[in-house]
């Protein structure tokens, strides 16, 4: 895991990472030692820019004089966010996932990204992404579907995920469109 430390005025230069996904916005502030100082995760409500702006203003207001060494964007809205906030770097999300996975597990050979609207799998061979698999059936099994179903069943999505992870038997919901998955669950 990544160490978390107090976000103080004397933390030195920081790096800000923004992941603007199809359904959520994630923002992290880390120090020069890659220790987490601040995180934010929220639904983007179809319009990520005001939410990101609000978070950045909050950070600058709470930490005047903060020295920002770099701001990097990734995700579905990478270019939009990069241009809107004049960020230093934009990083394709597959590369961002691979870089993060290697940090925690240098010999990683497979990565799964379950996003809000799609699901991607990356095969890693000889230290590089060798193949990418993308689900081709609308948003089956993705974040927005799972979140909607968790709410419909009266669960917080984190609790719902934990229940699924530790279930005695997996449930076959099919592998097609969420409309068909909805029918499978209701049966």
Predicted features by range, described:
Residues 1-7, 89-95:
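Charged, flexible boundary elements
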Residues 44, 60-94, 123, 130-131, ...:
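Short beta-strand-loop/turn "lid" adjacent to the catalytic site in phosphate-handling enzymes
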Residues 18-58, 136:
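Short glycine-rich, Thr/Ser-proximal phosphate-binding strand/loop in the N-terminal lobe
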Residues 171-187:
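A contiguous, well-structured pocket-lining segment that forms one wall/lid of small-molecule binding clefts
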Residues 28-31, 80-86, 120-127, 133-135, ...:
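Short acidic, glycine/serine/threonine-rich loops at helix termini
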Residues 27-29, 35, 52-59, 69-80, ...:
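N-terminal cofactor/phosphate-binding cores enriched in small/glycine residues
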Residues 44-49, 126-169, 182:
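Glycine-rich phosphate-binding loop plus the immediately following alpha-helix
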Residues 5-33, 108-125:
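Gly/Thr-rich phosphate-binding beta-strand-loop-beta motif of the actin/hexokinase/Hsp70
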């Amino acid at each position: 895991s990544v160490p978390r430390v107090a976000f103080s005025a004397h933390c030195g230069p920081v790096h800000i990472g923004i992941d603007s996904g199809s359904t959520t916005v994630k923002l992290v502030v880390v120090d020069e030692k890659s220790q987490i100082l601040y995180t934010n995760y929220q639904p983007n409500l179809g319009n990520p820019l005001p939410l990101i702006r609000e978070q950045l203003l909050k950070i600058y207001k709470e930490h005047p004089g903060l020295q920002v060494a770099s701001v990097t964007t990734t995700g579905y809205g990478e270019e939009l966010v990069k241009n809107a906030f004049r960020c230093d770097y934009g990083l394709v999300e597959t590369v961002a996932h691979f870089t993060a996975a290697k940090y925690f597990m240098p010999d990683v050979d497979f990565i799964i990204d379950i996003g809000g609207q799609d699901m991607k799998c990356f095969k890693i061979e000889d230290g590089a992404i060798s193949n990418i698999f993308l689900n081709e059936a609308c948003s089956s099994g993705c974040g927005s579907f799972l979140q909607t179903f968790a709410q419909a069943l009266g669960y917080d999505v984190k609790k719902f995920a934990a229940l699924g992870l530790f279930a005695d038997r997996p449930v076959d919901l099919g592998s097609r469109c969420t409309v068909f998955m909805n029918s499978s669950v209701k049966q």
